[in-house]
C-alpha cells in the first residue's frame, strides 16, 4: 500500500480535516501488508501509523530524514538514500518530488525490484503538469488546493531564483491562474501573491461547469495584488500566448491553479521533448 502526501482536498467526500482525510486514505490498508507513506504531516502520519499497527502492517514512513546530499540543478535533482546507500536522480525540479521519489523507490524494493532498476525507473519518469518545463522558462504545475499551492510556491521561487542567477539579470515572474469554484481560491491567490510576489498575474476561465467566474477571481486577486499587475483574459489560449509573447529570456512564467487549466494547455501545446520549444495548435 502506498499513501502520498495528504492535504485538504475533496473534503465533500473525505472529510473536513487532515486527520479525517487520512482516516479515509488509511482505509486501503490490508492486514499484514506493508504500507509506504509520506511522513511529513504529523497528524496524518499518526492516523496511518495507528491503523497500520491495528492491522499488523509493516510501516515504512518516508520523510526528508531518509535521504541526504540533495543536489539541485536545471532539469532535476539527485539525492542519496541513507539506509540503502543508493543515489537517485529525479528528473523534476520541485523539492517535494524528493519524498515522492523515495516513496516510489521503497515501494519498488518491497516488490523485489532491485535498486538499480528502481533508480532507472525514477530517472526516466515523466510527469506532465507537475513543475513541467514546456519551453524555456515556462512551467505547468497542477497545484489546485492550499497544500499544493504551498508546495508549489517554494519550488517556483527556487526555479525563478536559479534562472535569475544563470542569466545574471533580474528576471520577472509571470503567473497564469485559473481555479474551480469549490476550491479555496482566495487562500490560494493570497499565498501566490505573498510568497511568490509575481510581477504580473493573468486570470483566465476554464471550460467546465465547475469553473470559478471571472468576476469572483478578479475580486479575490485585486484584494491581494499588492502592486502586482492583474489582467483578465477569459480565453485560455489567448491568455497563454499573451504571457509567453511578453516574456523575456530571463523571465519565468508559471501556469497554475487547476488541473483543468493544465489539461486545456496540454491539448493546445505541441511539444517534441522536455527541452523543446512549444507552440500553440
Predicted features by range, described:
Residues 41-56, 60, 189-252:
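C-terminal helical cap/extension that packs against the catalytic core
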Residues 38-39, 51-72, 91-94, 117-125, ...:
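Beta-strand->loop->alpha-helix junctions that form or flank phosphate-binding loops
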Amino acid at each position: 500500500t502506498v499513501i502520498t502526501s495528504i492535504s485538504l482536498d475533496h473534503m465533500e467526500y473525505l472529510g473536513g480535516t487532515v486527520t479525517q482525510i487520512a482516516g479515509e486514505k488509511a482505509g486501503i490498508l490490508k492486514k499484514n501488508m506493508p504500507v509506504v507513506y509520506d511522513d511529513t504531516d504529523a497528524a496524518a502520519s499518526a492516523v496511518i501509523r495507528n491503523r497500520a499497527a491495528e492491522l499488523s502492517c509493516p510501516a515504512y514512513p518516508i520523510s526528508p530524514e531518509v535521504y541526504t546530499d540533495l543536489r539541485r540543478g536545471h532539469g532535476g535533482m539527485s539525492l542519496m538514500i541513507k539506509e540503502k546507500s543508493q543515489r537517485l536522480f529525479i528528473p523534476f525540479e520541485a523539492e517535494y518530488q524528493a519524498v515522492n521519489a523515495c516513496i516510489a523507490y521503497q515501494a519498488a524494493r518491497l516488490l523485489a525490484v532491485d535498486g538499480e532498476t528502481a533508480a532507472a525507473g525514477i530517472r526516466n519518469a515523466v510527469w506532465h503538469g507537475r513543475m513541467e518545463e514546456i519551453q524555456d522558462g515556462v512551467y505547468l504545475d497542477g497545484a489546485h488546493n492550499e497544500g499544493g499551492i504551498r508546495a508549489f510556491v517554494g519550488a517556483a521561487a527556487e526555479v525563478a531564483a536559479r534562472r535569475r542567477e544563470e542569466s545574471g539579470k533580474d528576471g520577472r515572474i509571470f503567473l497564469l491562474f485559473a481555479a474551480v469554484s469549490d476550491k479555496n481560491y482566495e487562500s490560494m491567490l493570497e499565498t501566490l501573491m505573498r510568497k511568490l510576489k509575481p510581477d504580473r498575474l493573468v486570470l483566465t476561465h476554464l471550460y467546465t461547469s465547475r469553473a470559478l467566474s471571472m468576476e469572483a477571481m478578479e475580486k479575490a486577486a485585486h484584494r491581494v495584488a499588492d502592486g502586482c499587475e492583474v489582467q483578465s483574459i477569459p480565453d485560455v489560449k489567448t491568455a497563454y500566448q499573451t504571457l509567453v509573447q511578453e516574456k523575456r529570456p530571463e523571465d519565468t512564467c508559471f501556469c497554475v491553479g487547476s488541473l483543468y487549466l493544465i489539461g486545456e494547455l496540454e491539448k493546445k501545446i505541441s511539444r517534441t521533448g522536455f527541452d523543446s520549444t512549444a507552440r500553440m495548435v
